[in-house]
């Protein structure tokens, strides 16, 4: 059954992480030190043994000029022996229920490949972040300042005013630099990722407040976009694409004019 983890589960969770993701002990210890929060970690036990896990981490996210909370989902893993039993489906569904209960309007994750991309689509996730080759200037930020706090101040100034971007605090920045230094200052860029709208009417109202567009929402399962008689008919995934402005210039002009194209940014998530 799905339950919250406890602090006593940490070593077992680390072992699963090592088995599934093959990360170094340094990375695993760093991740758990700053990201393992028992009541934000879901596990599935069979005969007392943890066989699957999902981590949720709260971040501030800029969305249509407002700051909202999102949950970043990571470490989604099931031991190979227990896959194809719908265990991860249960963890993701429970995580969505928890987000609704906690008034978290948005979920974000990074998909490792096309197979898991298709899997997450079943749960209303859609790609809204693109990978690119633009280098994040960590080396310049570190080498041009006298303290890490000064480096963070400039880092924060780069992203603080950007819409559709996760905000990192100073502790996050310290962790980012520790991982980056351990990786021999490996070049970092923006990564591809997916989002899921958990509170569609709340987020749509932020869009309406910012733009003054006042049409109503109507939901259907099919991924199409129809605007007729002041009613926007969409799926949850389609609405997510529109609100993020993800390649909206490719849509019909009437829709593209209402939802201008943006460049959502996702990076430095201990991915």
Protein language model regions, located:
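Short amphipathic alpha-helix that is part of the acyltransferase structural core
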Residues: 1-58, 65-68, 72, 138-170
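Short hydrophobic/aromatic beta-strand element in the GNAT-like acyltransferase core
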Residues: 39-43, 53, 75, 184-188, ...
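Conserved acetyl-CoA-binding loop-helix of GNAT-fold acetyltransferases
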Residues: 78, 84-97, 122
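Long, hydrophobic, well-ordered secondary-structure blocks that form the structural core
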Residues: 106-137
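Amide-forming acyltransferase catalytic core, primarily the GNAT-like/NAT-type
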Residues: 126-213
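C-terminal functional modules
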Residues: 193-271
């Amino acid at each position: 059954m799905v339950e919250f983890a406890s602090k006593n589960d940490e070593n077992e969770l680390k072992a699963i992480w090592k088995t599934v993701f093959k990360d170094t002990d340094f990375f695993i210890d760093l991740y758990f030190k700053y990201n393992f929060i028992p009541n934000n970690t879901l596990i599935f036990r069979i005969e007392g043994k943890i066989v699957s896990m999902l981590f949720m981490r709260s971040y501030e996210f800029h969305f249509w000029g407002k700051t909202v909370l999102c949950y970043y989902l990571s470490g989604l893993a099931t031991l190979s022996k227990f896959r194809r039993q719908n265990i991860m489906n249960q963890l993701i569904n429970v995580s969505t229920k928890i987000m609704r209960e906690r008034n978290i309007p948005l979920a974000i994750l990074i998909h490792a490949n096309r197979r898991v991309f298709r899997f997450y689509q079943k749960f209303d996730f859609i790609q809204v972040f693109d990978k690119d080759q633009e280098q994040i200037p960590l080396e310049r930020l570190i080498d041009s300042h006298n303290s890490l706090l000064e480096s963070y101040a400039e880092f924060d100034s780069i992203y603080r005013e950007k819409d559709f971007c996760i905000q990192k605090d100073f502790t996050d920045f310290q962790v980012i630099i520790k991982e980056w230094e351990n990786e021999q200052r490996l070049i970092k860029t923006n990564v591809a990722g997916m989002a899921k709208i958990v509170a569609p009417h709340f987020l749509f109202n932020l869009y309406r407040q910012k733009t003054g567009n006042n049409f109503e929402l109507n939901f259907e399962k099919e991924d199409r976009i129809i605007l007729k008689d002041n009613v926007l008919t969409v799926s949850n995934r389609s609405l997510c694409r529109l609100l993020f402005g993800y390649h909206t210039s490719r849509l019909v002009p009437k829709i593209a004019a209402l939802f201008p194209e943006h460049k959502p940014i996702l990076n430095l998530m201990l991915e």
